[in-house]
């Protein structure tokens, strides 16, 4: 199996997808305790660290990781926020690049909101791409929509892929799924069975247990 290290792991959506794709998670890092609890409840065997990624050293993982991934915080670039970009203390693109330099993974994958493609962030975006390429990666960036890949929701996301130069100089994103579905049509009875409809129907239970029903 391929090895991966993921930061900003959240409740584990991306981690579970990578698991299905054949990746063995060496380490998952998440800051929010409730999300960490969800991860641990669903996959007790995973090494989940509930910590600030600024305090994570990638040096112990040098040349041990195939994929370094992370859905770094969206608020700095989201249309729903103030779009402070690099001036937002929650911007973790620099930390992802630092870890890539320390770990030297074969592939780097970064996910963020489509606001990252806004013109106002063009200089910052170019800087990020250049820094990844300076580390020795062929870098590709594209806006993808989860519904085009069989996920029952509209979720456009920017995905940046960096492939180490010594491995290949070509890369292409997967073809789109022409039979995409989203909303009620896509979720059907699965979501009806899994999701509580309102707070009154939700018993008092830990975030981990509630999340476990969804995953």
Predicted region positions:
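Class I S-adenosyl-L-methionine
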Residues: 56-67, 75-215
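Conserved SAM-binding loop
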Residues: 39
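Class I SAM-dependent methyltransferase "Motif I" SAM/SAH-binding loop
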Residues: 7-11
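A short, Lys/Arg-enriched amphipathic alpha-helix followed by its capping loop at the start of a domain
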Residues: 17-25, 42
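Conserved beta-strand elements of the Class I
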Residues: 3-5
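Conserved SAM/SAH-binding beta-strand->alpha-helix loop
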Residues: 32-33
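Conserved SAM-binding strand-loop segment of SAM-dependent methyltransferases
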Residues: 45-52
